[in-house]
Amino acid sequence: TKVNDKVYVLCGTKTPSLIDRVAIDSLEAVIKMSRSLFKYLLIDVPAGFNPTSIAAAEMSDTTYVVAMMNGGYEVKHVQRALEIFAGWEDCANRVKTVFTRVVPCNDQSRRKLTEAMGCPVEAVMPNAYMVVSKAADNGQMALDLEPDSPLAMSINYLAGRIIHPPAGGIGDD
């Protein structure tokens, strides 16, 4: 489905929980085919690790572990999640962290999270629950609903870092 001139939604299950019904070899075939058609692929998987999310991560050039701030245990949860990827030779360059619903959403908060994590935090996103919910409920992109919002600025910042990584690589400032 074409969302706009630069964004296409290729496929998805009716609900995230149905991802376990997708055969791994079928997912890998779709990823391989998509790589030949598109410069960037975003594969959104449900929270937690399952064979499907692991296969997607293993085929990725970069894996973003995204956590929503919601009570204080997120740093420990992300640290534990990163342990799963520690066996990858290029883990430090290939696995990045992003925190959402960060208040205040600024570089100081990103630095504090980086310090708490013990590794770089690639980006922080503001708490934009209402606009994200409205966009999801209406099949729209949050960026289209509020293109000048702090959320849009944060997403555009991360997209810019993906497209044009800093000289030392993504995650370096």
Q: What annotation goes with each model-predicted range?
A:
Residues R21, D25-S36, Y40, V45-A123:
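Conserved catalytic-core segment of NTP-binding enzymes
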Residues R101, T114-A142, I155:
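Beta-strand-loop-alpha "switch" segments that mediate conformational coupling across diverse proteins
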Residues D137-D173:
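NTP-binding/hydrolysis catalytic cores, primarily Walker-type P-loop NTPases
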Residues T13-K14, A47, Y129:
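Short, well-ordered turn and helix-capping elements at secondary-structure junctions
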Residues T1-S36, S133-D137, M141-D144:
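P-loop/Walker-type NTP enzyme "switch/lid" segment
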Residues C11, V98, P126:
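Residues in well-ordered beta-strands of folded domains
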